[in-house]
Amino acid sequence: MVSRKAVAALLVVHAPAMLASQTEAFVPIFTYGELQRMQEKERSKGQKKSLSVWQRSGEEGPVDPAEPIEEEGNEMIKLTAPLEIGMRMNSRQLEKYRAALEGLLSEMLPQHAAK
């Protein structure tokens, strides 16, 4: 017969292995320290941009914040293919939001028909 210690050792190894195979584990790509450093870099980039806007406003007069700046990049994204947005609802959610959805559809359909 197999000793109790061997059975206990196999159980201790087998149980976590089974749990690990059944769960969807999240493996972080970045460590907590790396995330903090990246956030700090983003903050410093934001401060540099605001500083450059402030310096320009001193040289050229007040700068309108809504006015695009060359450094920020004036790229406009244009869709080349039709975009379809979908939503899944169960019957209870549909009953709950039916009036709001009908209102949105009635607003959107005349706009598309006019085009």
From Swiss-Prot:
Signal peptide bounds: 1-25
Domain of life: Eukaryota
Presence of the UniProt keyword Translocase in the record: no
Residue segments, region Disordered: 40-74
Official protein name in the record: Promotilin
UniProtKB keywords: Cleavage on pair of basic residues, Hormone, Secreted, Signal
GO molecular function terms listed in the Swiss-Prot or TrEMBL record: hormone activity; motilin receptor binding
Reported function: Plays an important role in the regulation of interdigestive gastrointestinal motility and indirectly causes rhythmic contraction of duodenal and colonic smooth muscle.
Pfam families: Motilin_assoc (PF04643), Motilin_ghrelin (PF04644)
Compartment annotation: Secreted
GO CC annotation terms, alphabetical: extracellular region
InterPro entries linked to this entry: Motilin_assoc, Motilin_ghrelin, Promotilin
UniProt similarity note: Belongs to the motilin family.
Disulfide bonds, paired cysteine numbers: none
Gene name of the record: MLN
Main subcellular location: secreted
Protein's UniProt keywords contain Membrane: no
